[in-house]
Design a protein with these regions (language model features):
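Active-site HxH/HxHxD metal-binding segment of metal-dependent hydrolases
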Residues: 28-33, 76, 95, 104-107, ...
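Conserved beta-strand hairpin/beta-sheet module of binuclear metal-dependent hydrolase folds
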Residues: 62-116, 208-229
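Extracytoplasmic/periplasmic, Sec-exported soluble proteins
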Residues: 81, 101-105, 131-134, 201, ...
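Metallo-beta-lactamase
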Residues: 57, 65-66, 71-72, 144-145, ...
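Active-site environment of divalent metal-dependent phosphoester hydrolases
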Residues: 105, 131-137, 158-161, 204-207, ...
């Protein structure tokens, strides 16, 4: 039986070469999972803190995780993996990225950027939602290739990232924090302004990013919510923070219409790709659905309330 380091080595070699060795293929033999099943397996993982075998194989399988990039809106491209998102927002003055995926797939993320015509020297901002490896784990590979980019997170997000990077299941991380934003602060490139919202709950350092997307003659308000899972809960106060964050994200004040999720399986986004690609600019868009977004947030808040009662009485 190979250990975790050997497994990751096999995966990395396979991802770099674009093929699987026989040993890696045997270890990673998995099947395609629909979003609903992935979500159910992650719920199971959050409750038991034990990775379901089928989910673990699916997450590590290049044949499942490596997907081509696609255009989501006139100014937004999906450049991430099947299970974890990364977005490229093109502006008149460079590119804004949201999240960086993780190793051993970060080279695929970078290849996706190049595929959609992005010169890495044109990246202005790399906005990271929180410190978990799947969101910041590609930053170390990207940084030397994107010399003009600034890397952004909240203070607690940076703290979590460096704590996790030094842990037993550690990962390569930047040498030090770059740009630290507080709740409500913004970055901009061209006419695009992105606001950081501190939305603790998934972790204490989780942030979400609020920005406009272009859809033909329409401008729609979008958000990338940093995290929705309850797999890292430390106490009832964190669940209270989670519930408050869900309510804030659903508020009329923010007026979010588009959920550009950090994890596609949470909204069935992978299954929407054909409709997204067929979308006529300015027409109905599969992701432009404020009522559905608010219903999801309300359901998540109810789930967190139930989890609080179950765990803490």
């Amino acid at each position: 039986m190979l250990n975790r380091r050997q497994v990751l080595s096999l995966i990395g070699a396979a991802a770099a070469a674009g093929m699987l060795s026989p040993a890696a293929a045997e270890i990673l033999r998995s099947r395609e999972l629909p979003s609903s099943e992935v979500a159910a397996l992650f719920t199971q993982f959050g409750r038991t803190h034990r990775m379901p075998e089928a989910l673990g194989r699916w997450l590590k399988d290049p044949a499942q995780q490596v997907i081509p990039p696609y255009q989501v809106f006139d100014n937004v491209w999906y450049v991430g993996l099947r299970w974890v998102a990364a977005y490229a927002v093109k502006t008149e003055d460079g590119v804004i990225l949201i999240d960086t995926t993780h190793e051993p797939f970060a080279q695929h993320f970078i290849r996706n950027l190049e595929t959609v015509g992005i010169d890495l020297k044109d990246i202005r901002w790399v906005l990271m939602t929180h410190g978990h490896f799947d969101h910041v784990g590609g930053a170390a590979r990207l940084k030397p290739l994107a010399p003009n980019a600034r890397f952004v997170m909240s203070r607690r997000g940076w703290e979590e990232a460096f704590h996790d990077a030094r842990g037993e299941q550690g990962f390569a991380m930047l040498d030090q924090p770059d740009v630290t934003l507080k709740d409500g602060e913004t970055v901009s490139a061209g006419s695009t302004v992105v606001t950081l919202l501190e939305t603790p709950g998934h972790t204490w350092g989780t942030s979400s990013y609020l920005y406009n997307v272009k859809d033909g003659s329409k401008t729609r308000r979008a958000v990338t919510v940093g995290g929705l899972g309850l797999n890292a809960i430390s106490g009832p106060e964190q669940l209270d923070a989670y519930i408050a964050s869900m309510k804030r994200l659903a508020s009329r004040e923010l007026a979010v219409e588009v959920d550009l999720t950090a994890h596609p399986f949470s909204i069935g986004m992978t299954e929407m790709i054909p409709d997204i690609e067929k979308h006529i600019p300015g027409g109905p868009h599969p992701l432009a659905d404020r009522p559905a977004f608010c219903r999801r947030l309300q359901a998540l808040a109810r789930g967190a309330q139930a989890r609080k009662k179950e765990l803490f009485g």
